[in-house]
Amino acid sequence: MPIKIPDQLPAAEVLGQENIFVMTESRAVTQNIRPLRVLILNLMPKKIETEIQLMRMLSNSPLQVDVDLLRIDDRESKNTPQAHLENFYHDFEQVRGNNYDGMIITGAPLGLVEFEEVVYWPRIVEIIEWSHQHVTSTLFLCWAVQAALKALYGMEKQTHGEKLSGVYRHHRLDENEPLLRGFDDEFVAPHSRYAAFDGDLIRAHTDLQIFAESEEAGVYLAATKDCRQVFVTGHPEYDVLTLDGEYQRDLAAGLDPVIPVNYYPNNDPALPPRASWRSHGHLLFSNWLNYYVYQLTSYRVEDIGKVFTYQQPK
């Protein structure tokens, strides 16, 4: 949460230059508090598992967050009970008229599928466009980053010949970036994808700010200059056993998957894995909620579309 200080205190200017948020008294007297509204577009097959992971991350904040769940594929799910979807999920038509402080679009197991072959691809594009006037800040995870780069910048997907799976080391590129507040200079995060996110290509084809990269996994964290689209190419929300579950699933399917790197002790899948990314995962979501959602959004959720003027990315 921000600290409140007198308007003319020298610290206000100094801390502001360091991107540390302070609230001046003149602003504080005009601020009221309301719950943040966050929409989660859940594209993962095991929706309940993903819900738990994301809500665990969102709950690690002093801010009250009200969550709506969204689905766009109305086909019967093989991994989530239909009753659960009917009881807890909205269709897009039910939320189209709403405004949200934040939105999260999850990954999806579609890394080797062309965008035009994805059944709900037109709806994905529509929701991304809709968010410009209805959402303060949108967080894209893994496959959703590919989708957003295509929808916003026309970037075609790049893929690895072999699935990138494991826990990779990253380095931060900006000491004062609020999204990385509290991060170590080097940190680890899980990845599970075929998608390739080459920093040189992203710099050449977008105006995104890149905040963290990995020599092995490529770009990890980036955002638009207005903070309204945030791109996370990994899975900081994953539980300790999620990568193991994916590995065992692929083994059972006869796919001969690679062993997730830096995950099992001694690289032995017979040994229980350990979570080494948990603290940075929580920090990332807390920082996003605080600096990119709470600090930027309007007090009246009805005013969100009026406050922001969308500009087409260059």
Swiss-Prot record:
**Catalytic function, reaction form:** L-homoserine + succinyl-CoA = O-succinyl-L-homoserine + CoA
Q: Which UniProt keywords apply?
A: Acyltransferase, Amino-acid biosynthesis, Cytoplasm, Methionine biosynthesis, Transferase
Q: Indicate where this protein resides in the cell.
A: Cytoplasm
Q: Name one GO cellular component term.
A: cytoplasm
SUPFAM superfamilies, A to Z: Class I glutamine amidotransferase-like
What are its E.C. numbers? 2.3.1.46
Q: What protein name does the entry list?
A: Homoserine O-succinyltransferase
Q: List the disulfide bonds.
A: none
Gene Ontology terms for molecular function = homoserine O-acetyltransferase activity; homoserine O-succinyltransferase activity
> Which HAMAP family does this chain map to?
MetA_acyltransf (MF_00295)
* Residues spanning the membrane: none
Q: What function is annotated for this protein? A: Transfers a succinyl group from succinyl-CoA to L-homoserine, forming succinyl-L-homoserine.
> Which InterPro entries does the UniProt entry name for this protein?
Class_I_gatase-like, HST_MetA, MetA_family
Question: Where does the UniProt entry say this protein principally localizes?
Answer: cytoplasm
Q: Which domain of life is it from?
A: Bacteria
Chain sites annotated for binding substrate = 163, 192, 249
Which pathway does the database say it acts in? Amino-acid biosynthesis; L-methionine biosynthesis via de novo pathway; O-succinyl-L-homoserine from L-homoserine: step 1/1
Q: Which GO terms describe its biological process?
A: L-methionine biosynthetic process from homoserine via O-succinyl-L-homoserine and cystathionine
Q: Which residues are annotated as site, described as Important for acyl-CoA specificity?
A: 111
What is the scientific name of the source organism?
A: Aeromonas salmonicida (strain A449)
Q: Does the keyword Transcription regulation apply?
A: no
What family is this? Answer: Belongs to the MetA family.
Write down the position(s) of the site called Important for substrate specificity.
192
Q: Give the residues annotated as active site.
A: 142 (acyl-thioester intermediate), 235 (proton acceptor), 237
Q: Which NCBIfam families match?
A: metA
